[in-house]
């Protein structure tokens, strides 16, 4: 089927992630670099401002300088003490100087009475208008209530809203059972769920954030051995920069025979910092650029899509969210179907097709925080469950709804997901059974029954009605076709039919609404993309030569130097691979035919002995990204770690880093070991680094102790080598990096014992042999 595939580049902008807020240059510079990168690819962006960033003049000036009429400014709905004071509302925080995500009862609108929520909206909107001369086009937060969303829409014309993906107990938020991905019209009583009719519907589309993986995002807490990580398109995390996952996600949007609007959100909070955001975001933009040129993808602002959606649909249209193959190689597949009445999650694994998730969307299921504020530090948004494996089981006893024959055995075969028409989708277990999902329910054809492993919400079965109750709320579903046998439903005349609500019929308006388009802009010119070197920062074998190539995304000439100075008009022009035989710092700049210059790119190359035998008792973190092949194998690798702690080149431990090297005796000029500090991620430089040297490992004596920096640096993320002058003949050495026992007081996690020490390499530079 022809499909609509839409991406939003939506970035969450905070001046600070703690209360009270303070200006942090790294966070500010991260936004500047994101703005430039998105503009370099020519895409529109949506930038949602927390109140502290809204009121900071430096952020105001930056956004006014870079944004144009194709971009959108929105509100990021995290509550601060100054915003409450401006609104005349008491700030409820009792956990000052903690991260916002841990304080749902004060830093989010749920922590305030409904009338106070409106006062907070009024205060924010007044200040936003004073700064930008208009109201924000969208409003977003990890969690929001329908009171806030409705008031922002009705009082200030805000056109779109967004909330977090489904997740379990992450950062104080549990959201599970809602629209699995994409966009819907919310209910007035519960913004987490789609409205079933126009009377109960808010006239503002809600988007789900972060681009969840249709397979593994929904396997949280129920799959043994599942890969660790955050399974979203967030570029600061491993899946979001994994080419396999990113490619699979875009394929699910553009190549799958899926139903309805295929949607993804890219972007990240600026407090994750540029060094960790850039590797993933740039790779995602590169793939997007190709898909846009092929006409397969629309890149829009959130409010632009919302305006189109509101004109095109009278009710939320059904949608599927699916992948027929597994990017991770584990052999799974998944399909989600959602309508105004229910959502159904199907999982394919080892040839078995199972229902893994089923929630219903009945009228009357109100949000817990509709009429009262939250009084705990953990929030919960959900829907009435028919199958909630995370709540009713776990990794060892996970429940499904299974296809079974008369002996209780599950069939196996090839699994295929597709769409039949704009309202109906299908999942086939070829040669055995077929699920057909429509807006009112689903039908299973074939000789197999449906067996519920567990249904703790069951109150009674009356005729064809399963009557259920969850937290005092009564609901249920109808077996319109099938023979009920306890918790198994057998086929009736070759089929089973479950219904969850009335089919609303056609939800698309008859007229076709034109899609939003980009406008010509006289916005600020952005610099071209800097040159890239291959290899990047590297440690090369002593006595050999290396050739470095430079390439650029944009047309122009590249000028470079090899002594670390910035290139000038008189510097060498790059014409081919650069030959290196000794240490060098390569700096390069791209100059376009129009005379625009990129930022200067810098790359460091060192030559060192590689014939070392390394041993280490240090236990590394078990995660592959921090463990690799171990210290002994990886400290002599060629490529150096970057300022991105997830680049796979840093070896991390909660122990002291302790490494002994043995080699053919010779004169050694220096020994250096590389370290990383990124305290927001729990990584700091070691307290001290000790070097022991000797003729062999049995005769080592203390040579020197280096005290590493212990305090905020010029940049939040820093690399630094501990460099020891040896200048003598040795055959062995030992380096011990002593970690802090507790995180230092200047760190965000001050006083906690989980102090990571990270190292990337050992560099042993030979000296000159005396005659």
Model region roles, listed by residue range:
Residues 655, 679-771:
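Trp- and acidic/polar-enriched beta-sheet ligand-binding modules for extracellular glycan
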Residues 12-22, 29-41, 126-135, 191-305:
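Catalytic grooves of carbohydrate-active enzymes
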Residues 52-143, 199-231, 259-272:
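Metal-dependent polysaccharide deacetylase catalytic core of the NodB/CE4 family, i.e.
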Residues 113-188:
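Catalytic domains of cell-wall/extracellular-matrix polysaccharide-remodeling enzymes
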Residues 523-529, 534, 601-665, 676-685, ...:
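Disordered, acidic Ser/Thr/Pro-rich linker "stalks" and the adjacent N-terminal cap
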Residues 520-630, 634, 639:
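Low-complexity, disordered linker/stalk regions enriched in Pro/Thr/Ser/Gly
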Residues 346-424, 430-431:
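Acidic-aromatic substrate-binding/catalytic surfaces of carbohydrate-active enzymes
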Residues 1-69, 262-265, 334-340, 345:
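Active-site beta->alpha N-cap acidic-glycine motif
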């Amino acid at each position: 089927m022809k499909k609509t595939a839409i991406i939003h580049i939506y970035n969450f902008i905070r001046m600070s992630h703690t209360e009270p807020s303070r200006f942090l240059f790294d966070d500010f510079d991260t936004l500047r670099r994101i703005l430039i990168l998105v503009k370099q690819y020519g895409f529109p962006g949506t930038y949602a401002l927390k109140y502290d960033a809204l009121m900071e003049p430096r952020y105001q000036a930056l956004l006014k300088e870079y944004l144009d009429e194709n971009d959108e400014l929105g509100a990021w709905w995290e509550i601060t003490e100054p915003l409450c004071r401006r609104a005349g509302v008491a700030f409820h925080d009792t956990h000052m100087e903690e991260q916002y995500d841990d304080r749902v009862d004060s830093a989010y609108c749920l922590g305030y009475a409904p009338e106070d929520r409106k006062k907070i909206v009024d205060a924010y909107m007044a200040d936003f208008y004073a700064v930008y001369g208009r109201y924000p086009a969208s409003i977003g937060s990890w969690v929001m209530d329908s009171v806030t969303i409705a008031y922002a829409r009705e009082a200030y014309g805000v056109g779109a809203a967004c909330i977090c993906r489904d997740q379990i107990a992450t950062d104080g938020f549990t959201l599970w059972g809602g629209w699995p991905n994409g966009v819907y019209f919310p209910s007035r009583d519960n913004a987490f769920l789609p409205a079933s009719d126009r009377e109960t519907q808010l006239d503002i589309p809600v988007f789900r954030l972060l681009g969840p993986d249709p397979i593994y995002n929904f396997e949280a807490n129920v799959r043994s051995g599942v890969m660790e990580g955050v399974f979203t398109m967030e570029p600061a995390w491993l899946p979001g920069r994994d080419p396999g996952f990113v490619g699979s996600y875009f394929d699910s949007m553009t190549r799958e025979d899926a139903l309805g609007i295929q949607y993804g959100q890219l972007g990240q909070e600026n407090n994750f910092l540029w060094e960790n955001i850039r590797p993933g975001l740039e790779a995602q933009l590169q793939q997007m650029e190709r898909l846009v040129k092929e006409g397969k993808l629309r890149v829009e602002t959130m409010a632009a899509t919302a305006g189109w959606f509101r004109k095109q649909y009278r009710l939320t249209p059904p949608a599927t969210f699916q992948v027929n193959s597994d990017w991770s190689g584990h052999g799974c597949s998944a399909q989600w179907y959602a309508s105004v009445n229910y959502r159904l999650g199907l999982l394919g694994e080892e040839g078995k097709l199972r229902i893994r998730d089923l929630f219903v969307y009945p009228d009357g299921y109100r949000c817990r925080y509709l009429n009262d504020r939250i009084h705990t530090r953990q929030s919960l948004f959900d829907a009435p469950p028919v199958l909630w494996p995370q709540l009713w089981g776990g990794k060892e006893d996970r429940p499904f709804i299974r296809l079974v024959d008369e002996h209780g055995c599950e069939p196996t075969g090839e699994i295929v997901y597709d769409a039949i028409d704009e309202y109906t989708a299908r999942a086939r277990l070829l040669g055995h059974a077929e699920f057909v999902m429509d807006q009112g329910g689903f039908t299973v054809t074939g000789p197999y029954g449906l067996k519920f492993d567990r249904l703790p919400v069951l109150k009674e079965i009356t005729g064809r009605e399963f009557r259920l109750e969850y937290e005092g709320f009564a609901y249920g579903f109808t077996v319109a076709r099938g023979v009920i046998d306890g918790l198994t439903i057998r086929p009736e005349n070759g089929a089973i039919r479950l219904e969850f609500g009335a089919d609303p019929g056609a939800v698309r308006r008859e007229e076709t609404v034109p899609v939003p388009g980009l406008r010509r802009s006289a916005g600020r010119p952005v610099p071209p993309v800097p040159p890239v070197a291959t290899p990047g920062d590297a440690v090369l074998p002593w006595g050999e030569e290396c050739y470095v190539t430079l390439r650029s995304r944009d047309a122009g000439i590249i000028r470079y130097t090899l002594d670390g100075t910035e290139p000038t008009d008189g510097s060498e022009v790059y014409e081919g691979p650069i030959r290196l035989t000794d240490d060098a710092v390569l700096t390069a700049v791209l100059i376009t035919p129009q005379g625009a210059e990129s930022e200067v790119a810098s790359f460091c190359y060192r030559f060192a002995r590689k014939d070392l035998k390394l041993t280490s008792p240090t236990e590394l973190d078990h995660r592959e990204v921090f463990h690799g092949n171990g210290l002994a194998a990886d400290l002599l690798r060629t490529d150096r770690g970057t300022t991105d702690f997830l680049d796979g080149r840093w070896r991390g431990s909660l122990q002291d880093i302790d490494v002994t090297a043995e080699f053919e005796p010779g004169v050694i000029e220096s020994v250096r070991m590389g370290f990383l500090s990124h305290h927001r991620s729990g990584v700091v430089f070691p307290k001290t680094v000790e070097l022991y040297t000797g003729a062999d490992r049995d005769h080592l004596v203390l040579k020197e102790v280096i005290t590493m920096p212990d305090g905020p640096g010029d940049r939040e993320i820093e690399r630094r080598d501990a460099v020891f002058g040896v200048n003598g003949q040795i055959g062995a050495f030992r380096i011990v990096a002593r970690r802090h026992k507790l995180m230092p007081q200047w760190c965000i996690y001050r006083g906690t014992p989980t102090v990571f020490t990270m190292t990337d390499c050992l560099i042993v530079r030979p000296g000159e042999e005396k005659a």
